[in-house]
A protein has these predicted regions:
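HAD-like aspartate-dependent phosphatase fold
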Residues: 1-200
Length: 200
């Protein structure tokens, strides 16, 4: 660890599993910080960092384990800021377990129907546990037919929460690309989230 001054560390599956913290990982990050290193947590959660951090204490992730946190939600918001003049078709639920409405709160966005949109914002599946991505193929075809670029708020295809697997926006983005659609990925493992993390 002496060779590095900064760690960019994933969240899900590394420091917690959505149900409880992984103590050894948190302790290792805390020790790294104690030696003068900086830790920036990066996650593909499609919500701003404030919502991500709000989960940490209940899960047992100590504040001493990190200096900063950057989410795919943060990087997606940066992308949406430069597209506030575009009409957006939003695909995903406002009432899911990640409370996706925080993704676009405070931004002056014009949400509309698919036939009027300039851009498709994919937050995820409406039912992350019970829906299957293939069920959305006909719906995604509307975006393909209108040549809408998709902004994928979470590049992950699935996430494990405790013992359950939940589908994520990345699964729909994969189908969209298979259908020859253009997808913009602000989150991991793509460049935007790392640039944002290093800027902080």
């Amino acid at each position: 660890s002496e060779r590095y001054d900064t760690i960019l560390c994933d969240v899900w599956g590394v420091i917690h599993n959505g149900r409880h913290a992984f103590e050894e990982a948190c302790e290792a990050l805390t020790r790294f910080r104690g030696g003068g290193g900086k830790v920036c947590l990066i996650t593909n959660a499609p919500v701003p960092k404030a919502q991500v951090i709000s989960y940490f204490e209940p899960l047992g992730v100590p504040a001493e384990a990190y200096d900063e946190c950057v989410s795919s939600g943060d990087a997606t918001r940066e992308e949406l800021k430069i597209r506030q003049d575009q009409r957006i078709w939003k695909l995903g639920s406002d009432s899911g377990w990640e409370r996706d409405r925080f993704l676009y709160e405070g931004l002056d966005l014009d949400f509309t129907d698919p036939d009027k949109a300039d851009l498709l914002l994919c937050i995820g599946l409406r039912d992350q546990l019970n829906d299957h991505p293939s069920l959305y193929r006909d719906e995604l075809r509307q975006g393909i037919d209108r040549n809408l670029p998709m902004v994928c708020a979470n590049p992950d295809k699935q996430v494990r929460v405790g013992g359950k697997l939940y589908w994520c926006a990345g699964a729909l983005a994969e189908i969209y690309e298979e259908m020859s659609g253009q997808v913009i990925y602000p989150g991991k493992p793509h460049a935007a989230i790392y640039a944002l993390a290093l800027s902080r």
